[in-house]
Amino acid sequence: MQPYRYHVFACDQQKPEGIPCCSARGSRQVLDALRAEVAAQGLGDQVQVTACGSLGLCERGPNLVIYPEGVWYSGVTPADVPEIVRSHFGGGVPVARLLNRDAAAARAEIAANKQKMQGALRAREAAGALPDELAQAIRGFQESRAILTAIELDAFTAVGGGASAPAAAQAMGTDSRATEMLLNAVAALGLLAKRDGVFHNTPLSARYFAAGSPDDARAATMHTANLWRRWSTLTECVRAGTAVARREPRAPDDQWTEPFIAAMHRNARERAPHVVRAVGTAGVGRMLDVGGGSAAYSIAFAQAGDGLCAEVLDRPEVLAIARRHVEAAGLAGLVTLRAGDLRVDDLGSGFDLVLVSAICHMLGPEENLDLLRRCRQALVPGGRVVVQDFILEADKAAPRMAALFSLNMLVGTEHGASYSENEYAGWLAAAGFQDVTHVRLPGPSGLMVARRAG
């Protein structure tokens, strides 16, 4: 492998309010412009662009340091990027007007800046100001809401290859003034770039949030937008101990089901290879996928197994979506679909493997025990059940995502929650399973695997 010819380090550190920093001066837009221009000029194999912490000279940011020469640029804007790429990376000639030439003065300014920042932090602490990380966590909903609204209104598609706020508003069917405020906020978050009053998608937003991209994640992200409404009832849910009725009418099923299954499919498509490798297909001729959603796991197992047949059990409206994925994979002969209710239905019999993925968190303890007992009845002697879910530590205060997801179940279900390894092991033993094993996988969820006793 050939080393990069140039390494570019761009400061993108966020600092407490009132303290100068490159991120407040548009460093994220500069980073996006650099990456896009390097790619456009075909220099991706020669130039590596990396975001880093504070370089100093914060009042003159955004700052870039370029190696191997150690060239330092200050006050860089997105408009400067084409010249930097063309002259410096393409021609080997640094852009003189952006250079910091006096190294001694720069070092002195960096030292003074450091003292100034430390003094400001001490003053904030003495005044009882919230630590910046805590303040950002409390206000984090603002950034999330701005992005979700942009996706709900299809703003990134409206911006396309470039659009003014009035043009985008016309395409979105929204108010021009409010649209510009929204697009400005999204640009500040780094998902749009704004040049001369015209908004442009960044490589990130064009890839995931604009129509026509092969990695279009809009439908999956709409599931998060739907969850927003549920999470707004969290305070009431904690008082009541369960999900509470929302004040607004529930969206039609197709507006809920499609985004939900799209989100689950996107996640399952990434995780399925890990699950198949961890579980294996040896000795598996028939598999039942309980609440199998888009059939992503059944497809992965059928593709990995030698003649393995999988059956997906789910609601009719979900199976209509699963059918599209099964047919697209060319596996209609190996993956079959069965309409049913996993909460009450007999699951059948004669299966070598039963997969219960992302189901148990929707149910209460008694419901999970009942489901696992029916899974046992569906298995041949010695057959395995595989439960994939968020698995909490014994004290239930970690991992972080599993603990937060438990709240997601509080606001969205009657009895659901995230559960610990000990709870799963207890249910499996009570349901008639043995050889219970916790298999840890990359990512937030793990597997509980057990074998039918007798």
Regions found by a protein language model. Give the residues of each.
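Conserved Class I S-adenosyl-L-methionine-dependent methyltransferase catalytic core
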Residues: 124-163, 170-171, 177-285
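Local cysteine-cluster metal-coordination motifs and their immediate loop/turn environment
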Residues: 5-25, 48-68
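Glycine-centered, phosphate/nucleic-acid-interacting loop/turn motifs that mediate DNA/RNA or nucleotide
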Residues: 62, 190, 383
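Alpha-helical subdomain
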Residues: 124-184, 194, 281, 290-454
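Ferredoxin-type iron-sulfur electron-transfer modules in oxidoreductases and energy-metabolism complexes
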Residues: 24-49, 71, 75-90
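Fe-S ferredoxin-like electron-transfer domains
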Residues: 71-124
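Phosphate-coordination loops involved in phosphoryl transfer and adenosine-cofactor binding
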Residues: 5, 284, 382
